[in-house]
């Protein structure tokens, strides 16, 4: 029997509502916003939370001066279509692209994330 369940992942950021809108729109999950906190939730229950942090410093990937501590990989059917959609939402395509079956982007708070195909 499991000791715990995986209820949510919490990501620090400078603007919780903005980052929730970015990922909520990308994943088509329900967005809930409160002061300094926001979350997105899938219909099947998975949740990602966003915690507003003063003096937030974005990670610098692939360097390690300010290392990433986590990043999201999301699966897509069409890399080109998904790239256009996340760029329109406010993502930035990272200059370092180390693979061919995925693409690396930065969310509006500077966290790396990948769009991946099988």
Predicted regions, residues:
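Core segments of cupin and vicinal oxygen chelate
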Residues: 2-3, 7-53, 81-104
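Short secondary-structure boundary/capping segments
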Residues: 39-40, 61-64
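A short, acidic/glycine-rich surface segment
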Residues: 55-61
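Mid-chain, well-packed structural core segment of small domains
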Residues: 64-86
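Short, acidic, Ser/Thr-enriched surface-loop or helix-capping motifs
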Residues: 107
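Short hydrophobic/aromatic patches at helix-to-coil boundaries
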Residues: 115-118
